């Protein structure tokens, strides 16, 4: 199911904010306060935490204020995204889209309210656990951020080794799989400068898929691309979503949707 969300401050009421959907209205009212269960012992606490995490949607933001460099840009944000959904986060530059994504990857703190992604409580997550969180999500930015002195294959092997992969045969198999997903299976030997802008962004998408993420987040992934190439990149995201991956794309290119 595809949703389009506009995160501008004007679309968020001051009280009990809901998110205005261009094609439908998604309403996430404030939850009634529930007194936490009293548990004793480390195992019991962990079991309760796991139970709570399992009950949450893939992405869940409840009454959270979104900041940019200590400046409040979006008050009382509520957002619920279920597993397998495809959501566009639409807004002009500076409207808070990127700040929402930074919060979701634990680059920004949760100052109030409640925020969860892929079973992790962003309000309480410890720094040492952030790398584990990010292995459960794929992240694609506007800038390609590829290693220019390495081939496409080498860029992907580098990421696999950085995230704990060791078996060469398994790594080669996974690289082939993700490059096939983005229709670049014949380009593994090429260097980034030998690829078009659209092809480089496809490599970044393939890199984001290496660890089979539950969630794929993209921040202005077509910002540097022409309209035709942008449309092709959006189609790649849709194909990924059809395989069951939750996709959240922040973009100002609402005409491309």
Enumerate the language-model features and the residues they cover.
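Helix-to-loop junction immediately C-terminal to a conserved catalytic motif
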Residues: 105
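Conserved ABC transporter NBD signature motif
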Residues: 113-121
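ABC ATPase NBD coupling module
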Residues: 122-138, 168-169, 240-242
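Short coil-to-helix segment of the ABC ATPase nucleotide-binding domain corresponding to the Q-loop/switch region
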Residues: 149-158
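Conserved signature/switch motifs of ABC ATPase nucleotide-binding domains
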Residues: 190-193, 211, 243
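Conserved ABC ATPase signature
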Residues: 191-195, 199-201
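Catalytic Walker B motif of ABC-type/P-loop ATPase nucleotide-binding domains
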Residues: 216-219
């Amino acid at each position: 199911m595809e949703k389009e969300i506009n995160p501008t401050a004007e679309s968020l009421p001051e009280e009990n904010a809901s998110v205005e959907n261009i094609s439908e209205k998604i309403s996430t009212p404030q939850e009634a306060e529930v007194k936490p269960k009293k548990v004793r012992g480390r195992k019991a606490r962990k079991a309760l935490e796991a139970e709570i995490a399992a009950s949450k949607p893939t992405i869940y933001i409840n009454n959270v204020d979104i900041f940019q460099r200590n400046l409040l840009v979006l008050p009382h944000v509520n957002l619920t995204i279920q597993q397998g959904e495809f959501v566009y986060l639409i807004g002009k530059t500076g409207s808070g889209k990127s700040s929402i994504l930074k919060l979701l990857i634990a680059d920004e703190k949760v100052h109030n309210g409640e925020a969860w992604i892929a079973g992790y409580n962003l309000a309480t997550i410890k720094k040492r656990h952030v790398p584990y969180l990010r292995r459960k999500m794929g992240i694609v930015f506007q800038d390609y951020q590829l290693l220019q002195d390495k081939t496409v294959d080498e860029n992907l092997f580098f990421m696999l080794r950085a995230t704990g992969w060791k078996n060469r045969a398994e790594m080669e198999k996974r690289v082939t799989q993700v490059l096939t997903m983005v229709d670049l299976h014949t380009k593994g030997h090429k260097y980034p400068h030998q690829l078009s802008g659209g092809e480089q962004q496809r490599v970044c998408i393939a890199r984001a898929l290496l660890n089979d993420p539950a969630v794929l987040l993209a921040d202005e992934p077509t910002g540097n691309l022409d309209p035709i190439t942008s449309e092709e990149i959006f189609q790649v995201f849709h194909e990924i979503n059809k395989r069951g991956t939750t996709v959240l794309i922040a973009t100002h290119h609402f005409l491309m949707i």
